[in-house]
Amino acid sequence: KEEDSFQINIKKMVSLINKKTRLIIINNPNNPTGSFMQKEKIDEIVKSLIKFPNVAILSDEIYSRLIFDNHEMPSLLKYPAIRNRLIVLDGWSKTYCMTGWRLGWGIWPSTLINHANKLAVNDHSCASAVSQIAGIEALRGSQKAVKKILKEFQERRNLIFEGLNSLKNVSCFKPGGAFYAFPNVSK
């Protein structure tokens, strides 16, 4: 909800988990709202999910290096208590402006690899050699461009946030990361 800065309501999330629940997906920073959960919120989520050992957790961290206002990304990889059921997805497309190159990666526990393979065979094809070489160069190269892009995205975020909130009957939550704005035009 906008009034909660689009943060996960942990109490509600836990109340919805039942014997059929197999996976919880966390997208941080969030698409489409741009909301960002800081470490304290992630700590609470992990603590609440420890009670459900049969529920896998998928952490979509594709925007992990596009965090505004000097905050740090609390990757779920830093929580040993859930590592045996944690899936982390990330990639090059957002950080290195390689959208469309379809180059990403995932970290899966060995117990979930067979399930991942069943999904992957129907979901995607191999990344081209050009994409793979470009990805290697992006990682090896200077990260100054990433900082420059982040600064530009933050300036754009500020501009769109202020502009939308200056409009009559429009409000907009201030995104904490990614490159999305989620204006409320329902007034």
Regions found by a protein language model. Name each.
Residues K1-K187:
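PLP-dependent class I/II
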